[in-house]
Amino acid sequence: MPKMKTHRGGAKRVKRTGSGKLKRSRAYTSHLFANKSTKQKRGLRKASLVSKGDQKRVAQMLTYVK
């Protein structure tokens, strides 16, 4: 059986933390900042964890990502 391949798009977007959780950046951060509040923009800078329902699917995409 051939080797599984890492999903390259997913690998660029998600990192694994030291404890094995999957860390991702937030959406809505590329443009249209004039109509977002300062508090909202500050919150968008923080990284977030992949939700529990998506963890299995994302982990499968990132087979070899450490």
Swiss-Prot record:
GO terms for cellular component: cytosolic large ribosomal subunit. Keywords: Ribonucleoprotein, Ribosomal protein. GO terms for biological process: translation. GO terms for molecular function: structural constituent of ribosome. InterPro entries: Ribosomal_bL35, Ribosomal_bL35-like, Ribosomal_bL35_sf. It comes from the Bacteria. Residues 1-28, 36-55 are annotated as: Disordered. Residues 1-26 have a biased composition (Basic residues). Pfam families: Ribosomal_L35p. Belongs to the bacterial ribosomal protein bL35 family. PANTHER family: 54S RIBOSOMAL PROTEIN BL35M, LARGE RIBOSOMAL SUBUNIT PROTEIN BL35M. This is Large ribosomal subunit protein bL35. The gene is rpmI.
